[in-house]
């Protein structure tokens, strides 16, 4: 399956799949994940479901995906707590643009996924909105300072 690149906001998003999809899969990605993207898409394509997959690049991983500010855990870079901005980008730019460019059904099932800190972002996003049909959090960074306490007080929607 060949990727198309679509500029959404100021980000070059990789789009795979087809219009009229039953599922819209959104994955926040870092540069390190793009090398294995083709095999991930091939595995998803083996299902019997029609899908549209958008790989959304994240530049400042620690800032854009962290739900609140926190000091550095490893190394020197702390966390900027800009997950709300990233979620807003998804809901106000990415999803509307994809729905405009691809004739997706009104009831398309939206699944947000991510690995590591992007997995934590996906879990956090599910506590902020009921927009997502499902969450795929692979090895989420639940070690993030304050996450366990937050998660107990804020159920997934």
Regions from the language model: what does each represent?
Residues 1-157:
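Non-catalytic cap/lid and distal C-terminal segments of serine-dependent acyl enzymes
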């Amino acid at each position: 399956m060949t990727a198309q690149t679509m500029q959404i906001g100021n980000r070059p998003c990789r789009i795979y799949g087809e219009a009229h999809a039953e599922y819209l899969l959104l994955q926040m990605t870092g540069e390190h994940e793009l090398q294995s993207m083709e095999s991930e898409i091939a595995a998803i394509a083996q299902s019997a479901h029609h899908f549209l997959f958008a790989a959304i690049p994240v530049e400042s991983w620690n800032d854009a995906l962290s739900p609140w500010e926190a000091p550095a855990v490893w190394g020197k870079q702390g966390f900027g707590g800009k997950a709300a901005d990233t979620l807003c980008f998804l809901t106000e730019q990415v999803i509307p643009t994809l729905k405009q460019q691809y004739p997706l059904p009104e009831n398309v099932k939206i699944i947000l996924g991510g690995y590591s800190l992007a997995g934590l972002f996906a879990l956090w996003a599910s506590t902020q909105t009921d927009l997502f049909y499902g969450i795929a959090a692979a090895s989420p960074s639940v070690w993030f300072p304050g996450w366990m306490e937050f998660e107990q007080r804020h159920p997934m929607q």
